[in-house]
Amino acid sequence: MTRQWPAPAKLNLFLYITGRRADGYHLLQTLFQFLDYGDTLTITPTADGRIRLMNPIAGVAEQDNLIVRAARLLQRHCFAAGDPAAPGADIQLEKVLPMGGGLGGGSSDAATVLVALNAQWLCGLDVATLAQLGLSLGADVPVFVRGEAAFAEGIGERLTPAAPAEKWYLVAVPPVSIATPRIFGDPELNRDAPQRSLAQLMTAPFHNDCEPIARKHFSAVEQHLSWLLEYAPSRLTGTGACVFAEFDTEAAARQVLSQAPAWMRGFVARGVNVSPLHRALSGAQ
């Protein structure tokens, strides 16, 4: 049976770089929250064992596409190689989240495929197993698989459930894509933030250590963030390029969006601590 599944965006409400491992991976402390806004995947299980993305993303080879990789990973885990009973899937992507935006679009798409096909193929894997599979696809995939707002440590793999205030956000989308290595590889990036407990971090002003680098090297990020800061507390999410302003009400966020200059593209969404994907999963069971 064909089903539609949400692949929500995330925000990093704060992001601190606390060190770097010998293998080059950065150690961090960050707070993830979902948005009630994102991509949509329409998935139809098939009997032929083939994984088909019906509308491939321009410029992304199939073997590099996280949607296809996630489906094949789950297929290999749940069914023996060459098993004639192994199901396939036709997957249609409605893409609204920008690539290189810091909203987790690719990771969220991959997580949605894992969670959705686990249900539709009747694999019966628990969320911990799915999250472990997801980690092999990317450090942000497990938080989307688990579906709870979370405090992340280590390289992002150590997750503690959290419950930040569910505010409204105006997210601005600068016309630029920022690759994570571009920011993490910058010699000026602050990598020695003090490690603090979640309780300490929740009572301190929120900050993103990647923000000064993104603002310095990407004029569009600087322009969009400077505009938002005139109206509300605003920050970079992830390594960018998207920036967000926080509001207590939807009306306040939409009022500011209505004043946005012609060069600014953005949207209003609510922060939620339970992923829309998991609400959809509960509704399907």
Curated annotation (Swiss-Prot):
Protein residues bound to ATP: P98, M99, G100, G101, G102, L103, G104, G105, G106, S107, S108
UniProt-listed Enzyme Commission number(s): 2.7.1.148
Pfam families: GHMP_kinases_C (PF08544), GHMP_kinases_N (PF00288)
InterPro entries: GHMP_kinase_C_dom, GHMP_kinase_C_sf, GHMP_kinase_N_dom, IspE, Ribosomal_Su5_D2-typ_SF, Ribsml_uS5_D2-typ_fold_subgr
MF terms in GO: 4-(cytidine 5'-diphospho)-2-C-methyl-D-erythritol kinase activity; ATP binding
Keyword vocabulary terms for this entry: ATP-binding, Isoprene biosynthesis, Kinase, Nucleotide-binding, Transferase
Gene3D superfamilies: 3.30.230.10, GHMP kinase, C-terminal domain
GO biological process, one term: terpenoid biosynthetic process
Enzyme's top EC category: transferase
Recorded catalytic activity of this chain's protein: 4-CDP-2-C-methyl-D-erythritol + ATP = 4-CDP-2-C-methyl-D-erythritol 2-phosphate + ADP + H(+)
Superkingdom: Bacteria
Catalytic residues in the record: K10, D140
Hydrolase as UniProt keyword: no
Pathway(s) the chain acts in: Isoprenoid biosynthesis; isopentenyl diphosphate biosynthesis via DXP pathway; isopentenyl diphosphate from 1-deoxy-D-xylulose 5-phosphate: step 3/6
Description of how the protein assembles with itself and partners: Homodimer.
PANTHER family xref list: 4-DIPHOSPHOCYTIDYL-2-C-METHYL-D-ERYTHRITOL KINASE, CHLOROPLASTIC
Protein family (similarity comment): Belongs to the GHMP kinase family. IspE subfamily.
Function, as annotated: Catalyzes the phosphorylation of the position 2 hydroxy group of 4-diphosphocytidyl-2C-methyl-D-erythritol.
Name of the protein: 4-diphosphocytidyl-2-C-methyl-D-erythritol kinase
